[in-house]
Amino acid sequence: MGRFNPPYLGAAYYPEVWPPEQVDEDVRLMVGAGLNVARLAEFAWSSLEPSEGRLELGWLRRVVDKLGEARIATIMCTPSCTPPAWLTEKYTEALVVDHRGIRAQHGSRRHVCPLNPVYRGLCGRITLELAETFGRDERVIGWQIDNEVRLWEGWGCYCAHCMRAFREGLRQQFRSIDKLNEAWGTNVWSQTYQSFDQIPAPRPAVCHHPSLLAAWMRFQNGSLVDYVRRQADILHRHVTQPVGTDMMPILEISYEQMHRSLDVVQYNHYDGVDNLWRQVFWMDYVRPVMKTPFWNTETSTCWNGGTSANGYREPGFCRANSWLPIALGGEANLYWLWRAHWSGQELMHGCVVSTCGRPMHIADEVREVSAGFSAAGDFINGTRPAAPGFAVHLSSLAWTHFKFQPVLPEFDYVNAMQENVYRPMMEAHLRADIVDPAAPLDGYRVVFSPLLPALDEGGLQDRLQKWIEGGGTWIAGPLTDIRTIEGTKPVCAPFKYLEDWAGVSCRYELPGAPRAFGVEWPDGRVWHGSVWYAGLEPGTAEARAVYEDGPLKGLAAVTETRVGAGRIVVLGTLPQPEELKRLLLGIAAEEGIYPAAEASPNVLVVPRKGPAGNGFIVVETQNEKGRLTLPAPAYNLLDCRAYSGQVEIQPYQVMVLRQ
C-alpha cells in the first residue's frame, strides 16, 4: 500500500484566500478533524499567474509540503474556471456571450467560452505548469479539471466562435443542407434552409423547431466535453495520477461522453434532509460510468448556500451523507468547504470550521466518519458493491428531448425517473445500475428502459436486440422508442422498433393527465397507471394486463413476447409505485434477481463482495427509525459488535457489516 490510501475524507481548501502563516493552523485543525485529503487551486488562477506569463507556484508547493508532512494528500485542480482579470481585460473575446447577445463581465466563474482559442491556449499553459510541477508528486493523488462545467445560463455560449462551430458541426454531420432539411422536417412553419449559414442559434424566447434545439444542446455538450478533453490530454502526457472533472447531478452534460477521456468520476451534490435519498439514484448512476471507484468531490457538512444558508441539517445527516458515496462504490467524500470564506460570493455556505477557525457543530460527526473510514478501511478497499444483474437506462438525450418536448404539461424527466421509477425500486431493495444507453449490457439479466425516446442513442438498438436474443429480459416503456435522435417522430408507427420487436401494435394513446385509467391483471386485481397510456394490440405477444375502463378498455397495457432466448415486456403505462414494485420484483425473481435485503424502505442496504469478504453497508436515509433482518450473523466494524436476526436501525445510522 502507498503512503496515502482510501477511503479518503477531506475538504476543499483555499489557502490563497488567507495569510500564508495560517496554513500551519489549518493543517493542525485538519489533522484533528481526521481529514486525509484536501482539494487545492480550483479558483486560484490569479494567485498562480498574477500577470500574463508570470507564474508563482511556490506558495502552492509549500501548502502541498505542509499537507503531506501531516499525511494529508492533495487533489490538484486546474484553475480554468475563474480566469484572472488580466486575461478577461486583454482577451475580452474569451468571455461568454449569453442568449441575449450580452458578453459576460469579469468576476463570475465558468463565464468563459469553452471554444475560444485564446482562452484554451492560456488554460493549456497553466495546466502544463501545474502538471510539470506536481505530475509525479506522490502527495498528489489525483487531478480535477476546472469546476462543475455546465452550460452558461442553461443555453451555452453564443459568440462568433460557437456559431461557426455549430454550423460546421451540422455541415459535417449532414453533408448537405437538403439532408438536414429532410432529417428535421423543416417544411413545418416554412423553416426550410437553403444553406447552413441560415441556421440560427436558438434562443429561449423563441418557439424553435425541436430538432434545432436538440442539435444546439448536443453541440454545447460536445464543446464542454472537448474543452475538458484538451486539458486531460495535457495532464495525461505529464502526470501519473488519475484525472477527472467534478460534475453536478444534471444531465445537460453527458457523463458517458465526458468520461471517455478521463480516469475517475468526480461528483458533487448538495441534497438535504428531504431529498438525500435522491443521491442513491445519482450514485447508482455515476458508479457504472467507470470501473474505478468514484470520488464525491463536494458535498455540504451542514448546509449549502451563497449569500444565504440553505437549510439546517438534523444531527446525524453529515454522518449518513458522508457514508453514502462509500457505501455505493466510491472511495472519497470531500466537503465544501474546509474554512468558511471571510469575503466573496459564498459567505453563508456550510463548512468544517468557521471563518475564525472554530469547529462547526458537526465536528464530532466529521471525526466519527473519519474513525469509521479507518476502522472499516480494509473492508471498504477490499470489496465492491455486488453486481446487481439489473440495469435502468438514464439518458442525457432523453433529458434534452423532454426539455423541449415534455409530452405532458410540466413533465420533468429526471424527477419522473427518480420518483416514479427509481424510488419504488429503492424502497423494495431491488438494487440496480443506472446506465447510459451507450453502456455495455454484458452482465445484466434485466434491463428497464422507461421514458427512453430514442433507441438509436449510443447504438443501443443493435446491441439491445442481440442482448435480448441472447437471453436478456428487456422492459420497455412507457414513452420509449417514440422519437429519433433528431427529435422527430417515426412515421410508419408510433414506435420506431418496438412494434416489430415485441409483436404488438399500438392502436392509440392517451395522456396520463388529468385522470388515471384502471388496468386489470388476469387474476382480477385492478391497479392504475400513470404518465402515459398506450393501448396495445398483441400480435405474437401475450397480453399480461388489459385496460378495464375508458377509451382503451380491452386493449393491452402490458405485453410479453419471447424473442430468441430472451423476452420483451412492454409497458403501455407506468404502474403506480406499489404496483411497479410488484411487477419488477416478479420479473427480477424470474431471472434469479432478488431484493438486497429484508429491510424497511428508509434503510439503504448495499451488498458488498470482494477479497476482504462479503457483507453490507447500511445507511438510514430518512432520519427515521428502521429495521433490517440479517440473513446470517454479521459483525459491525463500526461498533465492534455482532448482530443477527432483526436489527433496529436508528435515524441516520450507518453500519458496516462483515459476514
Per-region residue spans from a language model:
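Conserved, mostly hydrophobic/aromatic
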Residues: A11, M30, A38, L67, ...
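An acidic-aromatic substrate-binding cleft motif
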Residues: M1-Q22, V27-V37, F390
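The substrate-binding groove and active-site-proximal loops of carbohydrate-active enzymes
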Residues: Y8-P20, A41-G58, Q105-G124, V149-E153, ...
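Carbohydrate-binding surfaces of carbohydrate-active enzymes
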Residues: F196-I199, R237, Y270-Q659
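Aromatic-lined substrate-binding rim segments of carbohydrate-active enzymes
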Residues: D24-G32, R39-I102, R230-H238, A454
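Short, well-ordered coil/turn segments that N-cap beta-strands
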Residues: N5-L9, G34-N36, G68-T74, R136-I141, ...
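Short, acidic/polar
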Residues: V17-G32, C123-E129, M247-M258, Q279, ...
